[in-house]
Amino acid sequence: MKDEQLYYFEKSPVFKAMMHFSLPMMIGTLLSVIYGILNIYFIGFLEDSHMISAISLTLPVFAILMGLGNLFGVGAGTYISRLLGAKDYSKSKFVSSFSIYGGIALGLIVILVTLPFSDQIAAILGARGETLALTSNYLKVMFLSAPFVILFFILEQFARAIGAPMVSMIGMLASVGLNIILDPILIFGFDLNVVGAALGTAISNVAAALFFIIYFMKNSDVVSVNIKLAKPNKEMLSEIFKIGIPAFLMSILMGFTGLVLNLFLAHYGNFAIASYGISFRLVQFPELIIMGLCEGVVPLIAYNFMANKGRMKDVIKAVIMSIGVIFVVCMSAVFTIGHHMVGLFTTDQAIVEMATFILKVTMASLLLNGIGFLFTGMLQATGQGRGATIMAILQGAIIIPVLFIMNALFGLTGVIWSLLIAESLCALAAMLIVYLLRDRLTVDTSELIEG
């Protein structure tokens, strides 16, 4: 295994190495966005913009649940990988058990502190009038499924951590497939509308979590679901949370950004929220593919920063070129068939026109957004956790003043363009931070090989 890793780090063609490290991550991130696409796609057949808005308004809550999953999934997953590299299989059982039951406990806490306040939370998210009840109903199902949603994110990360990316993809594919089957049955067959969409996603997450649990119980001797092993110590907590907290923070700030944006859009009516919801789901496809690409090559870039800076530069060039190709293809698609893409989700012409405009603007930020992902990953890989944390905070902080200024100057059009402006500023900030820290970047290459 070590020789194979060294081959991809040092000798394989750059593109082959890039795909080896990135493809599983790209597929995983791509599948994760399909959940939201499915819900809006099927709800769109009901031709009710209030329902589309209700689903769109819940995006920040989903980001928070994902963040709670990443707290243990990313944090413990990377720790488990290091333990396996050190042949410390026994300790990995304790880490996995604690993280699994810690995630379940977090999910139960989410139910207790949110379910009684679903209406109030829906209002905070920006729901008004008829949309308020629909959003609240969707949130209730989401909150009740929180333990399984969090568990799903944790176990999916564990599958990757132990070197079973195919198991991760099978679990996600099965979940998406089940959602495709359940959504039309629950939404139309049982006439549950928004609640049906929420139930379809919830049941799919439950099924996926159970799939992973059964797999680990039968096939893994390094991931344990035995609650008796859920005994944390100071070292374990430190190793999990020093990586998990930044991952959690990034997801939380993503949700906060979505919340602030929803509040601005709410001033311009239901159609503005629905339009953004559709365009956001569409732009997520290439955005998450690029995110997976950038996160996947982090070990490759980090290793060659120390071992072969020429190869590192070639990798960075290859990633930037790949981002550029994705950007050109997506922009071409948006400007040629963007109207038809949006039309798959609604027949309301006002929403179609607005969503198409938003899609063009947000897709235009894809190139700089991708470069921002790449440079943030470089900061993480080369030991600059503080720089990466600063970037995560900036992503949430920059958008707020930009929104206020652009909204005051140009109204709804300004709110939409603020997305492109904020992404551009974040990308420039990432490049500046990397430049300023260029002489301080260090990495432990032995950890990369072992992990």
Swiss-Prot record:
It is found in: Cell membrane. GO terms for biological process: response to antibiotic. The chain crosses the membrane at residues 26-46, 54-74, 97-117, 139-159, 170-190, 194-214, 245-265, 282-302, 318-338, 355-375, 397-417, 418-438. InterPro entries: MATE_fam, MATE_MepA-like, MATE_MepA_subfamily, MdtK-like. Induction: Repressed by MepR. Belongs to the multi antimicrobial extrusion (MATE) (TC 2.A.66.1) family. MepA subfamily. This is Multidrug export protein MepA. It comes from Staphylococcus aureus (strain NCTC 8325 / PS 47).
